[in-house]
């Protein structure tokens, strides 16, 4: 490919106008496939089509919002052979894998088994490195091995259930139980009562509460503090680009109460993440992680999500994710002013340490509209009314289905993202736009950013 010999041109558009899926404005020449269907993938797609280097965009399977940016395509995104056939048939230059499941399933590895795809840019780690998210125990061992600050822990199976229950007795409440494998973001339990924690451990290990994901359970000490996330794009050779931080809001209810969700909103930047905390986070967590991947020979070209908590003893890692977060992507990626394709090409070439990242200094805030009943049972197929262009607000679709009338197709339906001089201004714009949109049962939190 002549892909990497080109002069790369940046064009930063604060209010891009997109017509169909032909998005190259100057020297259009690259075809991009984004894998996934959520708000994260819509936000990534929105940023990609702002690049002067994007000729055609495909999204698999996409949603009602991505259909306006590119061509939605029906693919089994965990089937590497099917994805590879599409890549070859449509001369794809860059594949951006949004969700974790295809990465843990080894889709990146599968694509690279085809000699003609040797130069394909794939954003997302190989299967071995994806275990950082695929296995909590694997991630904890990695952190311990590389002296990365995290909570003390032990891992148990159904054969060591009694030892696990005894270990719980040595801890102070609340008790943190984590299913080892992928559990759609629902595999972490924080329990105040010791007897209830013991019973839940049995439910997870013996009764397979989370299926195979809880065949092993990590029990760890509870860390008190305020959570936040930071993101990096790494090139697999020790180079990385640090992206903006964010704080998301997981609980369904006001004041962070009720059941966990995939995320009800997010804010970036995070006011308490000052220069001193940033320096310590980079020194104690980011760089040891990036270097640890190289030392352990874990092939990793892609986004690293650092789920962190700021404690009285400094920042500690709660979890790694091997892709961007959702809804964090909807506030982090819009702030990015560097051409995102430049970043992906530098990642592929191993030259990220030579590239500076420009970030919009304004605050971005997003609020998620969800289906009635979510995160429990909810109905789909509800017509969405009032969608249009909102001044200062971008609507990123998640659980929507394209058609003559766009309808709901998931629990989290749309993210309303706005910029402002501060979080209050940004949130005011998002909430104003939210009030113009409706569907039967629509719900959202009114207090995003309340603790910042």
Regions found by a protein language model. Name each.
Residues 33, 119-120, 132-218, 236, ...:
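Active-site nucleotide/adenylate-binding loops and adjacent lid/helix of ATP-dependent enzymes
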Residues 188-327:
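Internal nucleotide-binding/catalytic subdomain
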Residues 408-452:
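Generic C-terminus detector
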Residues 7, 21, 26-125:
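ATP-binding N-terminal substructure of ATP-dependent carboxylate-amine bond-forming enzymes
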Residues 12-15, 21:
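Low-complexity, intrinsically disordered or signal/transmembrane-proximal segments
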Residues 377-417, 427:
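C-terminal hydrophobic structural anchor segments
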Residues 282-304, 321-390, 401:
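Active-site "cap" helix and flanking loop/linker of ATP-utilizing ligase/carboxylase catalytic domains
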